[in-house]
Regions:
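Ribokinase/PfkB-type carbohydrate-kinase core domain
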Residues: 1-15, 30-172
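Flexible glycine/proline-rich, aromatic-decorated loop/lid segments
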Residues: 16-20
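Divalent-cation-assisted or electrostatically stabilized phosphate/pyrophosphate-binding catalytic cores
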Residues: 22-29
C-alpha cells in the first residue's frame, strides 16, 4: 500500500550553453521510465519471489498508465490501484549528463488536490484477511493520512497480519 510514482530518466551529453539563459543544453541520447516510490518497493518484492498485490492511486494520465503497465509487466496484481481523473500521478524526471544530475523536475498533485481514498479502504478490508503481510510505503504524497494508517493498523491487528512501515515522512 502506498504512494505510486513514475521515475523518468533522460541521459545525454552537454555540448553547449543555451543562448536564452546560462544553462546547459542536454542532448538526450536515451530515456528510461521506472517504477518509483511504493511501486519500486513492490517491484523489488516481486523480484524476490513475493506475490504482490498493489494498492494505491494514480491519475488518469500518461504517467498513471505507464505506472500500471510497469506493475503489470512485473506480474503485480493491480486490482487495488484506482485511477482518478482529478488526481495527478507523481512523476520525478531526472536529467543526467554523464555522471552529473543536471536537474530533477517533479510533478506532484497540487496540495489542495485531495487524494481519492474511497476505494482504498474498501479494497484493503476485503484483501488484508487473505495476505501474509501488509507493507505501507509512505512517501508523504497524501494517500496515507492518519485515518488510513489507523485503519490499516486495526485490520492487521484484527486478522493477526503483520503491518510493516516504510515511511518517508515524519511519523510523529
Amino acid at each position: 500500500v502506498g504512494d505510486l510514482m513514475l521515475d523518468r530518466y533522460s541521459w545525454g551529453k552537454v555540448h553547449r550553453i543555451s543562448p536564452e539563459a546560462p544553462i546547459p543544453v542536454l542532448q538526450v541520447a536515451q530515456d528510461d521510465q521506472r517504477l518509483g516510490g511504493a511501486g519500486n518497493v513492490m517491484m523489488n518484492l516481486s523480484a524476490l519471489g513475493a506475490e504482490v498485490l498493489a494498492c494505491g492511486v494514480t491519475g488518469k494520465d500518461e504517467a498513471g498508465e505507464i505506472v500500471l503497465g510497469l506493475l503489470q509487466e512485473q506480474e503485480i496484481d493491480t486490482s487495488g490501484v484506482s485511477q482518478h481523473q482529478e488526481y495527478t500521478t507523481v512523476l520525478k524526471h531526472r536529467m543526467i549528463a554523464g555522471h552529473t544530475h543536471l536537474l530533477r523536475m517533479d510533478v506532484d498533485p497540487p496540495p489542495e488536490n485531495e487524494v481519492p481514498q474511497e476505494g482504498l479502504i474498501h479494497y484493503l478490508k476485503k484483501t488484508v484477511p487473505m495476505v501474509d503481510a501488509v507493507l505501507v510505503s509512505d512517501y508523504g504524497k497524501g494517500l496515507l493520512g492518519n485515518s488510513v494508517l489507523q485503519n490499516i493498523a486495526a485490520m492487521g491487528k484484527t486478522h493477526n497480519i503483520p503491518v510493516l512501515c516504510d515511511p518517508r515522512r515524519n511519523t510523529n
